[in-house]
Amino acid sequence: MKKYNRIFTIVIDSLGIGEMSDSKEYGDVNVDTLRHISESVDEFKIPNLQKLGLANLHPIKHVEAVEKPLAHFMKMREASVGKDTMTGHWEMMGLKIETPFQTFTDTGFPQELLDELEKRTGHKIVGNKSASGTEILDELGEHQIKTGDMIVYTSADSVLQICGHEETFGLDELYRCCEIARELTLKDEWKVGRVIARPYLGMKKGEFKRTSNRHDYALKPYGATALNALKDNGFASISVGKINDIFDGEGITESNKSKSSVHGMEQTLEIMDKEFKGSCFVNLVDFDALWGHRRNPVGYAEELEKFDVNLGKVLDKLKEDDLLIITADHGNDPTYKGTDHTREHVPFLAYSPSMTESGLMETSDSFAAIGATIAENFGVKMPENTIGESVLSKLV
């Protein structure tokens, strides 16, 4: 019999908890997203994360460890190479990435790809470099409005991003161009993990703002995951936020797109009112997109405080046979140099109202403990060539 009827996994996108032994190989030294956020503010109130045991797991300024935490918790190491969104999420559900996704951070995209993209879309391309979304819009937004040229850029991730003004370039046109870019970047020499449509509004430098109509065109996972195992065996596999995009719809039975991280939590609370058996997998992207990449630790702290308020509502709604897992997919230390993700441990906090014990568990060798635990709970076999050790038996 299933131990839990519903498992809610909430990914606080980029909430790393300290460097790994190989972080230096990724250019990350003394990185610690959570601790450095807490050190950047005069006060930091996250009472619900606190009572679950987050400060027992990892030092947080202004937040004391509690004597009797509610959750079972552990650190998780990333087994895959990389520190990006797809790698982290795919690993959670059992896939280990052995070869890093190709990046074009230092070189920009090859001219042959740009020529083909211009020819197929009918738009001249500008940009073609690594930049933050804010920077590239300040530099080229006005130019696009005047000319209709297409802004193409990348980051330290394996991404090709296209900006389009919603009113002058058009949302449908932006999506059309991204679909062409996705088709072209399936070729091995040009392959990227994701093509991302980045719509925005505003008419002049300093006033441009990205909208919530972003769309990710991801590669399909190279193999089946825990999500496929759930769906194929008749269980619900509900996604909130960009989860559906990250897995290109594979293994998803219901998709809910979020306008913000607060909206994502509101959607989760609504889903909690429904009867289902299976998984609800939630990604809250604003922590990463709005605060981590933009190196804004104060904004990050405030977003965490907002999340904590909604977390309290989630805790109140949990049933005896529900399990809540809180985790992250990588780090993005907003006090660190540059604008890139940071390779860090991530937290694993697991709580159910039916638990009688709690406390620290041994560090997991991969993020895949999550998928393995979910699969064991529902009695489904993890697909071939997946990794991960379940901790279900410890969640008592």
Swiss-Prot record:
Binds 2 manganese ions. GO terms for biological process: 2-deoxyribose 1-phosphate catabolic process; 5-phosphoribose 1-diphosphate biosynthetic process; metabolic compound salvage; nucleotide metabolic process. Mn(2+) 2 binds at residues 288, 293, 341. It is found in: Cytoplasm. Mn(2+) 1 binds at residues 13, 329-330. Pathway: Carbohydrate degradation; 2-deoxy-D-ribose 1-phosphate degradation; D-glyceraldehyde 3-phosphate and acetaldehyde from 2-deoxy-alpha-D-ribose 1-phosphate: step 1/2. GO terms for cellular component: cytosol. Keywords: Cytoplasm, Isomerase, Manganese, Metal-binding. CDD domains: PPM. Isomerase that catalyzes the conversion of deoxy-ribose 1-phosphate (dRib-1-P) and ribose 1-phosphate (Rib-1-P) to deoxy-ribose 5-phosphate (dRib-5-P) and ribose 5-phosphate (Rib-5-P), respectively. HAMAP family: Phosphopentomut (MF_00740). Belongs to the phosphopentomutase family. This is Phosphopentomutase.
